[in-house]
């Protein structure tokens, strides 16, 4: 009989509305994403970048440790030897659709050449736009060098 009266007076609906009104006047916990952005952790792993030294020379020494450690096999490197005996990459491709953003490539790099930057807004309509070549990775590194250097400096004691 009590269940019948509860359903007759729409007890569940009234209880739900009271709960809604309780939270209606509390401060919001969500953000309006495209217009407001939450702070990013210094350990955030976003879009990849290749860094350069201060003199403009690329840091990558073509040791291929990042290619070997990548669990998704998203990195492809080809290298040639220079006249001075050092090795440099001729091809450095990352397939961002395969990448799982684990950060192992960044941890394996002995010269901090490959890093994951602060950008997380790099969606694309085509698959080919998400295959990054060496030039695009170097452009990303040039664009975010100050942010990347401060991020690596903050995280240095934990590495």
UniProtKB/Swiss-Prot annotation:
Matches recorded under Gene3D superfamilies: 3.30.70.3270
InterPro entries to which the protein is assigned, alphabetical: 4Fe4S_Fe-S-bd, 4Fe4S_Fe_S_CS, NADH_quinone_OxRdtase_chainI
UniProt key word Translocase: yes
BP GO annotations: aerobic respiration
Annotated [4Fe-4S] cluster 2 binding sites: 70, 99, 102, 105
Pfam families in the cross-refs: Fer4_7
Keyword annotations: 4Fe-4S, Cell inner membrane, Cell membrane, Iron, Iron-sulfur, Membrane, Metal-binding, NAD, Quinone, Repeat, Translocase
One GO CC term, this protein: plasma membrane
Residues at which [4Fe-4S] cluster 1 binds: 60, 63, 66, 109
Cofactor note (record): Binds 2 [4Fe-4S] clusters per subunit.
All copies of domain 4Fe-4S ferredoxin-type, residue ranges: 51-80, 90-119
EC number of this enzyme: 7.1.1.-
Family under the similarity heading: Belongs to the complex I 23 kDa subunit family.
Function: NDH-1 shuttles electrons from NADH, via FMN and iron-sulfur (Fe-S) centers, to quinones in the respiratory chain. The immediate electron acceptor for the enzyme in this species is believed to be ubiquinone. Couples the redox reaction to proton translocation (for every two electrons transferred, four hydrogen ions are translocated across the cytoplasmic membrane), and thus conserves the redox energy in a proton gradient.
Subunit structure: NDH-1 is composed of 14 different subunits. Subunits NuoA, H, J, K, L, M, N constitute the membrane sector of the complex.
Official protein name in the record: NADH-quinone oxidoreductase subunit I
Organism per entry: Rickettsia conorii (strain ATCC VR-613 / Malish 7)
